């Protein structure tokens, strides 16, 4: 029998917003961590209510989270994070594994704000983590080994697909997948509205469009096909699909989509420099 995957006894969250709650919910649902072994902190009770409903422990003390948990996920707003790290730095030890989900805060900045040799990772999730179907990338700091990386990847797979990448890819992931959720929604909306134009009721059209995206994504992931191959499989000579694809090409779908990812990535890099 294969050895059980390692799992920390306690996981802490500093910041208790929607993404933190989604990650905690995924960990609990997947049985990776028991609810009573999760401790979350926030300045007020407003965001802590979700953690309390999950059966997690809560506090208003960020230092208490660090003193109780060796794996801590920082899910604060980026502009707040430096002050939070300064607050908890006195209780950080070399035993801690600290994870930041704050967009635009580099590993070098995190390491500068924390004691020497602190083990730090950056994680960038996207909104579908809320339904445990997220696309997540993580980048490790200078003092993080493969065992810590594998542990975090094992945990985050409770929230979707998790890939380790060089830090240089994190901003690209923002353009591709963070912002990509909105791009896909825009396409799904347009797909459904095309059906509405042709006479289908709106609610039905939107359900079918969303299911079409879901089914297509599963085929690409489960069968390992390149999108071009699946697209070719759907086309028949002189059939409906090739006529529709021609219309998309005339509308510049590919170029517009590539430009959208490029624009979002450039903006992410710009924000990272501020």
From Swiss-Prot:
- Family in the record: Belongs to the pyrroline-5-carboxylate reductase family.
Q: What is its EC number?
A: 1.5.1.2
Q: What is this protein identified as?
A: Pyrroline-5-carboxylate reductase 3
The terms describing its cellular component in GO are: cytosol; intercellular bridge; mitotic spindle
Give the reactions, separated by semicolons, that this protein catalyses: L-proline + NADP(+) = (S)-1-pyrroline-5-carboxylate + NADPH + 2 H(+); L-proline + NAD(+) = (S)-1-pyrroline-5-carboxylate + NADH + 2 H(+)
Whether Acetylation counts among this entry's keywords is yes
Record's HAMAP family? P5C_reductase (MF_01925)
According to its UniProt record, what is one Pfam family this protein matches?
P5CR_dimer
Subcellular location, record wording: Cytoplasm
* The protein's role, per its UniProt record: Oxidoreductase that catalyzes the last step in proline biosynthesis, which corresponds to the reduction of pyrroline-5-carboxylate (P5C) to L-proline using NAD(P)H. Proline is synthesized from either glutamate or ornithine; both are converted to P5C, and then to proline via pyrroline-5-carboxylate reductases (PYCRs). PYCR3 is exclusively linked to the biosynthesis of proline from ornithine.
């Amino acid at each position: 029998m294969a050895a059980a995957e390692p799992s920390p006894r306690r996981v802490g969250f500093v910041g208790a917003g929607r993404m933190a709650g989604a990650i905690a919910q995924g960990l609990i649902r997947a049985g990776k961590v028991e609810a009573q072994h999760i401790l979350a902190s926030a300045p007020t009770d407003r965001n802590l209510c979700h953690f309390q409903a999950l059966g997690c422990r809560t506090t208003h003390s960020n230092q208490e989270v660090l003193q109780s948990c060796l794996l801590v996920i920082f899910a604060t707003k980026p502009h707040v994070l430096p002050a939070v790290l300064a607050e908890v730095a006195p209780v950080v030890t070399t035993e801690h594994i600290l994870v930041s989900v704050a967009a635009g805060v580099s590993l070098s900045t995190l390491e500068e704000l924390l004691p020497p040799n602190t083990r730090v990772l950056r994680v960038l999730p996207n909104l579908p983590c809320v339904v445990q179907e997220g696309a997540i990338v993580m980048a490790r700091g200078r003092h993080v080994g493969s065992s810590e990386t594998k542990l975090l990847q094992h945990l985050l797979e409770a929230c979707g697909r998790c890939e380790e990448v060089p830090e240089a890819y994190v901003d690209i992931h923002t353009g591709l997948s963070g912002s990509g959720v909105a791009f896909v929604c825009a396409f799904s909306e347009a797909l459904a509205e095309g059906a509405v134009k042709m006479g289908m009721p709106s609610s039905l059209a939107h359900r079918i469009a969303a299911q079409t995206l879901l089914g297509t994504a599963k085929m690409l992931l489960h069968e390992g096909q390149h999108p071009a191959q699946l697209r070719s499989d759907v086309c028949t000579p002189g059939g409906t699909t090739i006529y529709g694809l021609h219309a998309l090409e005339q509308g510049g779908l590919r170029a517009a989509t590539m430009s959208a990812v490029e624009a979002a990535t450039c903006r992410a890099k710009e924000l990272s420099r501020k």
